[in-house]
């Protein structure tokens, strides 16, 4: 087996970076779950996609730079009523970047809160259905209110 002249690792990384830059769109919308999240000025995340049997099908590092995070985080919180956190399913607008030392990562430039709201609504409906099947959904309604309360709490 004959090979062409060998490349240095940094040359190969440069070729990979150039190929990605030339052949990819400027941004992509990506569905993923936040597997880890760290705030240190910038927001560092690890995004995962899980298969049907809950094993990890894909995993990548993502960064939301401080200037973007200060815009996106309050917007997401205002729309969904919660902060970005581990376990949330999110729809992110990302730029793909490749660095010779750090490898491939995603830079977060946008977020669609309606995707997360849809996922939360689906989870809520599944929980309600499960509680109804277990017979505990209407248990509180079966309790009667006494005509004369025995205890009063003052706060």
Predicted regions and their residues:
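Acidic, two-metal ion nucleic-acid-processing modules in DNA metabolism proteins
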Residues: 1-155
């Amino acid at each position: 087996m004959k090979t062409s002249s060998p490349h240095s690792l940094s040359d190969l990384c440069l070729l990979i970076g150039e190929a990605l830059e030339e052949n990819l769109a400027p941004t992509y919308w990506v569905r993923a779950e936040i597997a880890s999240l760290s705030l240190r000025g910038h927001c560092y995340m690890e995004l995962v996609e899980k298969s049907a049997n809950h094993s990890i099908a894909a995993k990548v590092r993502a960064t939301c730079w401080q200037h973007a995070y200060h815009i996106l985080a309050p917007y997401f919180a205002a729309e969904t009523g919660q902060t970005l956190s581990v376990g949330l399913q999110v729809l992110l607008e990302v730029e793909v970047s490749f660095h010779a030392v750090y490898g491939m990562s995603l830079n977060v430039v946008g977020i669609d809160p309606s995707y997360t709201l849809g996922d939360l609504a689906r989870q809520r409906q599944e929980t309600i259905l499960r509680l109804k099947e277990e017979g505990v959904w209407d248990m509180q309604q079966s309790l009667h209110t006494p005509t004369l309360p025995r205890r009063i709490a003052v706060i």
